[in-house]
Amino acid sequence: DKPVIGIINTYSDFNSCHGNLNGLVEASKAGVLAAGALPLSFPTISLHESFSFPTSMYLRNLMAMDTEEMMKALPLDACILIGGCDKTVPAQIMGALSANIPFVQLVTGPMSVGSFKGDRVGACTDCRRIWADYRSDNLTDEDVLEASNQLVPTVGTCGVMGTASTMALMVETLGLMVPGGACAPAVSAQRVRIAEESGTLAVKIANLNNNPRDWLTERSFENALRVLLAVGGSTNGIIHLTAMAGRVGINLSLD
């Protein structure tokens, strides 16, 4: 019998962070088929930070429940979790760990950077600076329109070391995605190749019944915290790593 590999599709027209997701689903399916298994995609809710503030943490937990229950309900041998926006990746990891089914995380990747008045700019860090300049009458309405077109020039997650990029690095550090899978841009051939590799890896872990709950340890999360400090990542990473560790019975503290 061929392994059944589930592929979680979190695409939404409202979610530009996941604008390339349907293509990644198809690339993942190609990797699964090439490895001799059956890929079947299914949806869960899609969270976009811009539209879920200030309740996005609550919605993270709701998405974790959605992910867990769908993975438990379906006849899966392994699963590919595809997402990217801030709360999505920790929600998917939390749900998958509780479902206790082998999985691979695939992130959508960061958007390209823009240029405004000769400076490299990226959402969401520069939008706050530019808005402050506008409110101080240092920028015109036309300037703000130009900046808006440059802050989000492509699909993908925020092109700064915010929560999305931070969590992608943390998950790669934990060994839950294809090596090198955290940073490739959303609009790159490398992102598509990573999706195909994720499909192949999902089949491999299904055949081995390689479940992260069996090998994630306190040292694993301590290592992720070290990387968090090394890259100057988002402080939200601490909150999400703590929640993820709790799903495998690890009490992660600042001590």
Language model features with spans:
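Active-site cavity-forming subdomains of large catalytic enzyme subunits
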Residues: 57-223
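Re-entrant/interfacial helical elements at transmembrane boundaries that shape
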Residues: 19, 239-246
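Catalytic phosphate/nucleotide-handling subdomain of diverse soluble enzymes
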Residues: 248-255
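Flexible, glycine-rich loop/tail regions that form catalytic "lids" or insertion modules at the edges
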Residues: 225-227
